Amino acid sequence: MIYDVIIVGAGASGLFLGANLKGKKVAILEKNSSAGKKILASGGGRCNITNRFVSAKNYLGEQKFIEQILKILSPDQVLKFFSELKFSEQKQNQFFCDSGAKSVLGLLLKRQNADIFYNKEVLGAKKVDEIFEILTKDEKFRTRNLVIASGGLSYKALGASDVGYKIASEFGIELSPTTPALVV
């Protein structure tokens, strides 16, 4: 089978994308036995979902690109997606889920438009003609479009790995040096 889109990583970004890709055959490959481990840990288990004031200057990278992304997906649009959950605005205009991070993860899973494959650690990827081939320990997946949403290097105990960096390097994508960050 050839998927329209394969997403590597069932964290916040991968699950959010999978829930919003409609009308396509989508798969998510997750190396852990369950999705969203970092979601469950975020905000002390209360999941700080977004901030009221989000600006490109708060991010490292190409400012114009970041500005375009923030225009496409604003904090209000994120809150609208999660509108069936109740959020409280707290210190520094942060939004926390009143019913906890498990509710956020549950909603992301409920709204999935993707087949999620657990225990599928990605070992590498290559492009053959116009098709990406994604290799796991026991299976090969094929797709027309590949999204790397494997997260950063923090919280190795929750499944963090450098697979996204390796795949990006294999495809000649220039990477910025990683730096520690604190979300405020």
Predicted segments, located by residue:
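Short beta-strand to alpha-helix junction loop
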Residues: I66-S74, K91-K110, F117, Y155-V163, ...
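Residue-level signal for inorganic ion chemistry
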Residues: F82, L108, A168
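Redox-cofactor binding/interface segments in oxidoreductases and associated redox assembly factors
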Residues: V8, A41, I148-A149
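Predominantly flavin-linked oxidoreductase catalytic cores and closely associated redox partners
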Residues: S34, R111-V184
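Short beta->alpha hinge that forms the Motif I/post-I loop of the SAM-binding pocket
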Residues: K31
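A short alpha-helix-loop-beta-strand transition element characteristic
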Residues: A35-A41, I69-S74, L85-F95, G172-L182
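N-terminal Rossmann-like FAD-binding beta1-loop-alpha1 element of flavoenzymes
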Residues: Y3-I28
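Glycine-rich active-site loop/strand segments that organize a redox cofactor
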Residues: G44-K91
